[in-house]
Swiss-Prot record:
Protein's name in the database: Large ribosomal subunit protein bL12
UniProt source species: Vesicomyosocius okutanii subsp. Calyptogena okutanii (strain HA)
Signal peptide: none
Lineage: Bacteria, Pseudomonadati, Pseudomonadota, Gammaproteobacteria, Candidatus Pseudothioglobaceae
Gene3D superfamilies cross-referenced by the UniProt entry: 3.30.1390.10, Single helix bin (1.20.5.710)
Disulphide bond pairs: none
Length: 124
């Protein structure tokens, strides 16, 4: 007897009618003691956790210093602890990250401080 390949078997099944395929499946279930019914993963669906993970670290990005450049420089200097020249250079190079990995509370406080002096800020 010649060995049948998977492709030969698939081609033979493709040429069969639907009724013949149903009978073939039934015969295979009987011969091998298996069931062709689909198993529904009900337990898996029930275990899915729908909680949203809230970000807890933010990078504060100065996108624009607006019209009050001097006030923004002072605020950046106060926030970062940098010198006047470094703060000025940082503000003038906007968009720039003012602080990395800040907590949510700290990031919101810095954002508020910068917006109060007219800067545009983004939390990432």
């Amino acid at each position: 007897m010649a060995k049948l390949t998977n492709e030969d078997i698939l081609n033979a099944i493709a040429d069969m009618s639907v009724i013949d395929v149903v009978e073939l499946v039934s015969a295979m279930e009987e011969k091998f003691g298996v069931s062709a019914t689909a198993v529904t993963p009900v337990a898996v669906v029930a275990d899915v956790d729908n909680t949203v993970v809230e970000k807890d670290e933010f990078d504060i990005m100065l996108t624009s210093f607006g019209e009050k450049k001097v006030a923004v420089i002072k605020a950046v200097r106060s926030i970062t602890g940098l010198g006047l020249k470094e703060s000025k250079d940082m503000v003038e190079s906007a968009p720039v990250v003012i602080k990395e990995s800040a907590s949510k509370i700290e990031a919101e406080d810095i954002e508020r401080q910068l917006k109060e002096v007219g800067a545009s800020v983004e939390l990432k």
